[in-house]
Design a protein with these regions (language model features):
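Bacterial N-terminal signal peptides that target proteins for export
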Residues: 1-11
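C-terminal segment of classical bacterial N-terminal signal peptides
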Residues: 16-25
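Sequence/structural segment immediately N-terminal to covalent heme-attachment motifs in c-type
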Residues: 29-39
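The canonical Cys-X-X-Cys-His
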Residues: 37-47
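Outer membrane beta-barrel
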Residues: 51-52, 79-90, 102-216, 229-233, ...
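Short cysteine/histidine-rich metal-coordination sites, predominantly Zn2+-binding motifs
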Residues: 53-67
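Short Fe-S-cluster ligation motifs
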Residues: 66-85
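Outer-membrane beta-barrel pore domains
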Residues: 101-103, 146-150, 154, 240-401
């Protein structure tokens, strides 16, 4: 076993042990802090990771308990926030067989900037508009999310209706609200467009949505009928018991085939996942299992992702540690372009966050990827290509105001 991976596993085990032993303390986007007089830690375990109160605040359509919300002209401040990440990285790529170093990258960069407006547009009507640019990759300034939620169709947010471009994810395990700069390899979060019914009641949080499928224009555009895209649906639920959360989710959608012919217009892709968030004292443990089948339009081809993550609050509201291990395992189907020779890999990340103030943190992080290719997370890019071993050392700043 690689000594770095062994070290990460030891750190994760220690974090889990300490999390059981340390006393628990009960723990916002800056725009919400200004409007409601809240501290960031009222909604976040550590920015951007939500606590239980933050999850309920979001699912209520950005309303506090027993409040209906206001019109924009009644607000005491503009509901707008800016969020950004800057980083210095030193990355290396090695031959998976000889271990010889193939390349080295060393640079400072602005990774991403976001503008976000969120709050209530009227009593019981919440909204979120998020726009972002991946500056380091030269990406465009684009729309991440734009949705409205009509809350309290059944009282106390037992049932809400949300529509627009939004995220299909669990609130306790989110690509957008992770501590690490390194993204999750597992299919944790999907950006979808459509309508969703959601709510929470007596420790149960739930949602079901009908959304556009995952098909996109391909090489043979004429063979892809994108006039009937509203063919995806999903449902998820989670239950909180003794401060721990268990979640399940099912996704059924259409996706483009990886074969150029004869299947162009996509086949059904399905996903079933289960997650467990164990929250002890000042620590958390996240476990995830993700099963995809009929991936890439290939009948019966499946892929499994496994995720283990531990987080520890070493100094209250100041110093946090995070360690994560992920593995991707793809089944074999004769003639498929997605077989294990091109679709397996592992990812290990070790992370330290120090909060200078509640909305500004300094980050140090190490990530190692071992992959054989397709859909293995290349460092810095979700669902990219990792054709060899890669490792990255990173120093960064994450801020919101």
């Amino acid at each position: 076993m690689d000594r770095r991976i062994l070290w990460i596993n030891v750190v994760l085990a220690v974090m889990i042990l300490v999390a059981f032993l340390m006393p628990r303390r009960a723990t916002a986007i800056p725009a919400f802090s200004r409007e409601h007089g809240l501290n960031c830690n009222d909604c976040h375990v550590a920015f951007p990771l939500l606590n239980e109160f933050g999850m309920e605040f979001k699912q209520r359509g950005f309303r506090l308990p027993a409040q209906e919300g206001k019109y924009p002209w009644e607000l005491s401040s503009l509901p707008v926030s800016a969020i950004g990440t800057m980083q210095y990285l030193n990355a290396h790529q090695h031959d998976p067989v000889t271990k010889a170093r193939l390349s080295t990258t060393s640079e400072a960069e602005i990774e991403e900037v976001e503008l976000m407006a969120a709050g209530t547009a009227a009593p019981k009507v919440g909204f979120l508009a998020e726009f972002a640019q991946e500056v380091a990759d030269g990406g465009p300034f684009s729309t991440e999310q734009v949705w409205m939620q009509f809350s309290d169709i059944m009282p106390a947010s037992v049932l809400n209706l949300r529509a627009g471009k939004m995220l299909n994810e669990h609130y306790h395990l989110s690509q957008k609200r992770r501590l690490t700069f390194q993204q999750y390899l597992a299919p944790v979060t999907f950006n979808v467009t459509g309508a969703e019914l959601n709510g929470f009641w007596s420790g149960i949080r739930y949602a079901a949505g009908i959304v556009n499928d995952e098909r996109e224009e391909g090489t043979n555009t004429a063979a892809v009928n994108l006039n009937t895209k509203l063919q995806g649906f999903y449902t998820w639920g989670s239950y909180t018991l003794w401060d721990h959360i268990i979640g399940v989710r099912y996704i059924n959608t259409k996706a483009n085939s990886d074969h150029p012919s004869p299947i162009i217009d996509g086949r059904t892709r399905q996903q079933l996942d289960a997650t467990l968030n164990l929250r002890f004292n000042r620590g958390q443990v996240l476990l995830g299992y993700y099963h995809n089948w009929d991936i890439g339009g290939v009948y019966k081809q499946d892929r499994r992702n496994y995720l283990v993550e531990g987080m520890l609050e070493v100094i209250p509201e100041k110093l946090f540690l995070d360690a994560r291990y992920e593995m991707q395992d793809t089944g074999t189907v004769a003639g498929s372009p997605n077989n294990p020779a091109t679709a397996n890999g592992t990812l290990v990340t070790g992370h330290i966050s120090y909060y200078v103030v509640q909305n500004v943190r300094v980050v140090a992080e190490f990530t190692k990827v071992r992959g054989e290719g397709l859909d293995v997370l290349a460092i810095g890019e979700p669902n990219g290509v990792a054709s060899s071993n890669q490792e990255r050392y990173l120093l960064g700043i994450h801020f919101a105001f």
